[in-house]
Design a protein with these regions (language model features):
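Membrane/wall-proximal cationic-aromatic binding patches
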Residues: 29-91, 110
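Short, basic, glycine/proline-bearing loop/turn elements
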Residues: 37-40, 92-100, 276-280
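A conditional alpha-helix N-cap/helix-loop micro-motif detector
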Residues: 45-46, 104, 285
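Membrane-embedded segments
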Residues: 72-163
Length: 287
């Protein structure tokens, strides 16, 4: 066979090899102010499970991070990203971090992975009662939401206390599919050395490069993009509260419990549970 048939393959392998050895710092410039503006309401995987986008968000002085779970993606005109949509009226734009399955443990890992950038920052945490079940975060949600890159960053934070790192490690060891158990066991016992790593430097380098590249790919529209605002940007808090009460009353007329009409229909069709007392336990591991 002629060599020319293999030239495209050889070139592809060479380019791939070059990509692997390039440092992630060469790609960090891809995350610009425009990237952050696009990502702040995207709830994309690269933002939720990455490290570079959130790091640049904290370094910027243009955003106000809001941590939560599924409520951040709700098609509601009182979503903070809709209420505070006008950049001319609000110096800091909401940056939404969280989606369904993002319990307090997931949020705590995200925050701790940026610990050295948190000093002097303001943020909001939306806490949901249904996080605090008997078992806490499920193995399924752990596998889907936990980020190896963020865990690696967490354990490398210079100013995060060893005691807090131990608590993280002990909690993580309770999940059956957590990776690098040997490392976590060392951290839990306080026997970690500077040479130990949760994720290898090579693998972390690849994670960061992929995040930087994907951060500029076209984003799918979220439900937030189709919401028609019902508030004005210069409304006072009193006016916002009155409009919220009116909106809530208008959209909960099908039942005496004042449950949103759409959700009530799901309950009637047995697509949502009525009794959810089990979802809150003061002895939950999430506390």
């Amino acid at each position: 066979m002629k060599l020319k048939h293999f030239i495209p393959i050889i070139i592809s392998l060479c380019l791939f090899g070059i990509f692997l050895i390039l440092p992630s710092s060469w790609f960090s410039g891809l995350i610009t102010q425009k990237t952050l503006d696009n990502q702040r309401t995207s709830l994309s995987d690269q933002m939720l499970k990455g490290t570079l986008i959130q790091e640049q968000m904290f370094k910027s002085n243009h955003f106000y991070p809001i941590y939560g779970s599924s409520e951040l993606g709700k098609d509601d005109p009182f979503n903070p990203s809709i209420l505070l949509r006008d950049k001319n009226m609000h110096a800091k734009q909401p940056f939404l971090i969280g989606t369904g399955g993002s319990t307090d443990l997931i949020n705590a890992v995200e925050l701790a992975s940026q610990y050295d950038h948190l000093k002097g920052k303001k943020m909001s945490l939306i806490i949901s009662p249904q996080w605090f079940t008997n078992h806490g975060l499920t193995n399924k949600n752990f596998d889907a939401r936990m980020s190896k890159a963020q865990l690696n960053r967490l354990f490398k934070q210079k100013h995060l206390s060893p005691e807090l790192k131990q608590r993280y490690a002990k909690r993580l060891l309770r999940f059956k599919n957590v990776e690098n158990r040997n490392y976590l066991e060392k951290v839990a016992k306080g026997k970690i050395s500077d040479n130990d790593q949760y994720v290898s430097s090579f693998k972390m380098n690849q994670f960061e490069k992929i995040e930087a590249i994907k951060s500029n790919l076209p984003l799918a529209n979220t439900e937030l993009a189709d919401i028609t605002p019902v508030t004005a940007q210069d409304d006072s808090w009193g006016m916002l509260r009155n409009k919220a009460e009116y909106y809530g009353a208008k959209h909960s007329q099908s039942n005496i419990f004042k449950i949103r009409d759409e959700y009530w229909q799901l309950i009637k069709k047995h697509k949502r549970k009525v009794n959810r007392d089990y979802e809150f336990n003061s002895n939950s591991p999430e506390f």
